[in-house]
Every structure is written in C-alpha cells, then in structure tokens.
From Swiss-Prot:
Keyword Repeat: yes
Superkingdom field: Eukaryota
Protein name: Tetratricopeptide repeat protein 22
SMART domains assigned to the protein according to its UniProt record, in alphabetical order: TPR
Start and stop residues of the TPR repeats: 66-99, 101-133, 155-190, 203-237, 260-294, 296-328, 432-465
InterPro entries: TPR-like_helical_dom_sf, TPR_rpt, TTC22
Amino acid sequence: MTEAEVGAEDLDTLLDELDYLPGHFHLEMQLNFEPRSPAQLRARDLKLQREGLRQELELVATPQLPAVRHLLGTFSFYLEELGDAREHFLEVARKDPGNLNAWANLAHVYGQLGQEEEEEASAGRLASLMGLEGDPEDAGDPRLRAARCLAEQGYAHGFDVGCASPEERAQVLEAGIALYDKALGYGQQIPIEEKRSWYFTMATLFIRLDGIFLEMGSEEQKRLPAFNRTLALLGEVLKSSDSRHQALAWCYVGMLLERKDTFSTTPMGVHEYGYSGTEPLDCFGKAIEIAKNQPPILNRLAKIFHFLGKQDMAVGTCNMVLAVLTDPELNWQAYCTRAKVRIRAYVHDLERAKVGLGGLPDRNHLACAKADLEEVVKVCPSLRTYLDISQVYYYMGVDAMRELLAVDEAALNQALVFLAKAGELELGDTLPELQLLRGKCLRVQGEDANAAACFKRAVELDDEGSSHTEGFGCLLEALLAQWSQAQLSDGEVGYEVDVWLRHAQGKYPAARLRQELQRVWRGHTEEVLGLARALVAQGRPALVRLLFETMEHEGEDAGGSGKSRVSS
C-alpha cells in the first residue's frame, strides 16, 4: 500500500470515528439524494425554496445568518451556479474564519470546479480547525465551533426539497431536531441569546412535525412528548430580547394551546409551563402587541393567521401594518396577504354555496382583493402577484354558480393578460397553477382544445404525490366537451383519456383521484356513460372499471354525505 493510500485510509478511519461531520452535502436530506423529479421541476422547486429563504434574511436573527447563507449556497450548487455557491460560502468564511461548514462546503465546491489547490487548502483549514492535524487552532473553542456547525445543519432540515410523502417530511424534521440536540450538547458555553435562537428554530420544527403527525393520524402518545417539549422551548424563547422571537413565540404558544384539544386529556406541559388559564386569543394578542410598529414582524404574523384560518385577525393585522407603512413598494406583503384573505373568503363561500350551505359569495371580496393587488402590480409585480390578480379577474369574469358561463369577457381577457405576464417570468411556465387557471379561462371562452393543452401541462407539472387533482378533472371535462361537439372522434377521445388516466394514476394518490372522478361523474353523467360505451367498444376498459368503482364508492358514501359537507 502506498503512502497516499495509507493516508487516505487513516483519514477515512478518523472520519468514521467523528461524532459529527461538517458540511451540508452529506446530510440525510432529499436535497442531497438523487432527484426523483424531472430536471426542470427540480430546478423550479429549488428556485422557489431559495426565493423563500431570501425573504427569511429580512427577519432572521444575526446568529442564524450563516445557516441561511449555507443553505443559499447549497441551493445554488444544485442549480449548477457554482460561482454563486462559492461566494455564499466565502462570505461566511470571511465573517467567521472558524466556521466549519464554510470550509467543508468550500472544499466540496472547489472540488467540483476542479480547483485542486483551493480544495486542498479548504480541507486543510477544516482539518486544522477540528484538530485532525494535531492541536486545533488556538482561536476559539472547538466545542463551540462544533455546536454551531451542528446547529447550522439542523436549520437546513427545515428547508428540504423533494420530499414526496408525509413520512419523508417527518423523517427530515426529526433529523434536524436531533442535530440541534447534539449542538446543545456541545454548546453549553454558547451565548444565551444565540441559544434561544436555536430553541426558536427547534420549536418551529417540532410544530411542523406535530402538524404532520396530525395529518397522518398518529397516536397521541407519539405526539405528546414533543408537544410538551415544544412548550418548554417556547417558554425559553419568550425570555429573548429579540422582539421577533418574542412575538412569534407567543403566536406559536397560541397555536399549541389550540391543538391541546386534539388530545384526550390536556397535555401536562400546559400546566407545567403556566398556561392552564391562558386562552389562545390572549397569546395572539400578546404577539401583536409586541410587534406593533414593526411591519416585518406584523406581516409574518398576518401570514400565520391567514394560514391558521383566522381571517379577521389576519386582515386586522394587515391593517395595522398599513397604518404604519402604506407604501406598496416597501410594504407589498401586507397588501398581498390582505388580498389573499379576500380571495380565500370568496372561494370558501363559493364552495359552501355550491353544496347548498350558504348564499352567493360576496363579490365585494373580489373588488377589495383587486384594489390591493393593483397597488402592488403597479410598483413591484411578481409571479405570485400576477397569479393572484389573475385569479381575481377570473372569478369576476364567470358566473358564481355556473363557472362555465362568462359574465364579463373583459375581466377574463384581463386575467389572461396577467397570466401571460406571469408566464414571461423565469418560473412562470413551470407552475401547474398558472396552467390550470389559463386553461379555465380558455374553457369559459369556448377554446376547449387550447384549454385541454393547458390542463395537460398542469398535470405534467404537478409533483408526484400531489393532491391537486383539479387539473386532471378539468382535462377530462375539456375532452368530454370536445367529444360531445364532435371535435374529437371516439378513437381520439378514447386514446386521450386512456393515456392521461394512466398518467394521473401514476401521479396522484388513489383516494384523491377517485374523488376527482366522482366530481366529473356527477357533473357530466350522460357524457361519461357515452364515453364508457365508446371505450368498451375500443377495448379500453380501464376508465370504465374506475368509473364503476367511483359509483360504488359514491353509493357507499351517500349516507355520510351530509356530515362531510358540513365538515368541508
């Protein structure tokens, strides 16, 4: 064995014995695994996640800035923007020469760039900082360096890309929490405010994990220890001098107190940490009080309230922000969140009206949303804003109860204009929701062939495992419309349905696909029966079998339909 081989073997042995390994490119995250989605969709998801992370820079606490920079560099690396990735890691190294992840990540990037000298220098610096080449460098405590390295890695697990199931998302979050726990073991001497920023991120990971467990219907004994620990972590965060952490911690405590009713008995942590007589609304009020006159924090709270379905509270918070800062260029978030609340209110009331649980939705919601979004579009248009205002114009252009009936052609055309502008932006044509909305506009205008092309693209762009089956349902409806108008022959429609049904079966969960077929069946019974006869005649019975299954499930569910409608 040569000297070089012996050295390499010694290094491998040493690395195997380490309790931790710096760098982001070896972490057990979907980001680092072989992509399961096509390159275009993978790039889209990375860029969207990166854009969201950039917005975090406005609010993130100073100790967590290196963690954000490392993630930005990692996303750039996988987007093959190696120069940009290198600059992110170099920026961390310049501000903190003892940052272990910076040197590990730089060594990886330099290796990909073929810059062997820089790669060796970075690896050497890392080895020296870790004490792998004798004594560690004098500057700084090696245990503190290890703690910060692990915390930065734990932070990354909150921004993974490519998880295809709740189980995978849960595993990634659990891994991130474990890294923070290990960081705390190394970091007894970490400054208290920095440690509280770790507690804050851990709490957010725990809350997201609990949400996944709720979604999966996990037993409460599996949720209980983490629930109690999250309350303890938030109790420490409430002692922080950082008003952002204080405000959001109160908001999260309110969220947890609302979730306590999902347990058969009140979790002990509620009593142990002093929340026995505390109402969730009190917590939300304290969060707003702490954040008053601070638009970035208020905007974050408004988004959380919107996500939680507390629409009045979200609008009130947006109004508070706009009273402090009215400029839409500087405060576009408040205008956009308030518009989203209005759109959601309209759609919610519309869905209830369609199943007979309420009157027609108030179209004033659309007028208010339009006014807010137009303020933003004038000064700082974005992909999301274009999509939102297109949705508003779409609903303004169609009859509330008969969506295929146009009531305002000018509004529909304006929706298509904004969708075209969205499509001109970098990621515009990669978003399934853009293709779906464009197809719906065209379908109302009688352009069924063009609409079908949009719906096909929406299905193609959907992630595997997605529950958003509306594009597939709209595609079936467009094909049925073309067939009933003799624009497609029996053979052509049979081929199209067969191909896209198989595509949908490989992409969407079976239960969601069945629900979508039920919706199409109920709305187009005569056409579906005619199509079934045509498919049987052509020797394509797959859809026919699915339709029979749909009818069976619908019959089984009929007795409980009232209950499901109320819950919706």
